Every structure is written in C-alpha cells, then in structure tokens.
Amino acid sequence: MKKLLCILCSLLIVLFAATSFAAAGEKRVVLGIDRIDEPFAKQLLAGKRLGLFTNQSGVDSKLRSSTELLQKSYNLTALFVPEHGLFGAVAAGETFESHTYKDIPVHSLYGEDRRPTAKMLDEIDTMVVDIQDVGIRHYTYFSSLAYIMEECAKAKKQVVVLDRPNPLGGAMQGPVLKPEYKTFIGLYELPLRHGLTIGEFASYINATQHIGWGVGGGGVGGGGGGGGG
C-alpha cells in the first residue's frame, strides 16, 4: 500500500516522498528519487535532456547517487550545484568554478553566477531537483532553487522536484524574516524553522511569488508534509 501526492503546475511538478508499508507492517519513507522508475516519472522524464540540481545529499534510500541513477535511466546532460560544491567539500562562503564530472558539465551556482544562465539552460529541457535541505531558513539551497525556478520560468523549462522529508519535521518555530533583511541567505519571509520540505517550499514560492504560469493540483490519497508523508 502506498500513498501518493503530486502537486502539478504548468512550470513545477513535485514528486513527493510517500509512505509505504513493509511486509512486517512497519512504515518507511519512499523518497522522490526512489520513484523515478514509476510510470508517472517516466512520462515526465523519458526522451528529455535533463539537468539536475543536486550535491552529495542527492541519494536514494539505498544511498545510491541520484546523479548516477538518472544518468543510467535517462538522458542527463548537465548538473547544477549550490554552495559547498558537488561533494560538499568547498568551505562555507567560498566560491567555486564550473567543471565536469563523468563527462557531464557541472555548472556552479555559487561562483560568478548565482543563477543558471540562458546558455546553461539551453543544454536541458527539464530541470530535476534532488537535494536535502536542513529545515532552517538561513540555508542557501532554498535560494539557489528559487533562482533556478525563476530562470526556468523565463526559459519555459519544466522543473521537477524529487522531494524528501524535512529532518526537523513539519512544525514552524522562531522569528519570521523581515523584508528589509532579505539576502541570498534568506530570500523569503519564513520563520527560522520553516517546517517545509524542499518540494513544499518550491510549491509555496511558485504560488506566492507567481513564478509559474498558474497552479493546479492532483494526486491520489494523502502524503507530503514536513515529515514526508
């Protein structure tokens, strides 16, 4: 038995983590990346040039790299990488240059460019997102995702978020960011502990910042949430 919830927008599609039940009756989380071979995902991704926004946190429930999984199953043509680099080895606040990994272009989004350029986006048809947030506002991965969504909207590129649970759960706590203090470290008026998964954040800013071209919804059963389903 599995619960499935997908939020659909003309720009944005979120493949939420789901809850499944093992033979012993125990619940376990199925990550968005765990579902890339399902028919719904294949309809979204097959036959398209894929970009992937990720780093070392992009792994499935068996700790297999999302980069390698997408490269194996689909046409992965470019990687887009936030602060700290592809493997988390770059110090906080330190910029890094674009490079290649296993013959795939790796575009730095924490160097000369903080946003994907039109030239970068020319390499892809769809941007896939699989990255782990930590559940607090002052973390630059959310900002990089927001910039990706804005530039993909301009270029009319679809964004598919492979969701994963918020490690701090779904509760919100702490002061809300004041507009006059917005920076790349905190772009939106969210509480310090925001309670959102990265997919929920993407859906939220797509609606509130009017990034996409209208919002619709669909799915079967329940799921999502700060706990992943």
Each language-model region and where it sits:
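Conserved anion/nucleotide-ligand pocket segment
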Residues: 182-222, 227-229
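Bacterial N-terminal signal peptides
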Residues: 7-18
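Short internal beta-strands
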Residues: 77-85
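Glycine-rich oxoanion-binding loops at beta->alpha junctions
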Residues: 92-124, 136
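Glycine-rich, charge-decorated loop segments at or immediately adjacent to ligand/cofactor-binding or catalytic sites
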Residues: 88-93, 160-182
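A short helix->loop->beta-strand "cap" motif at the edges of active sites that frequently abuts
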Residues: 74-75, 152-158
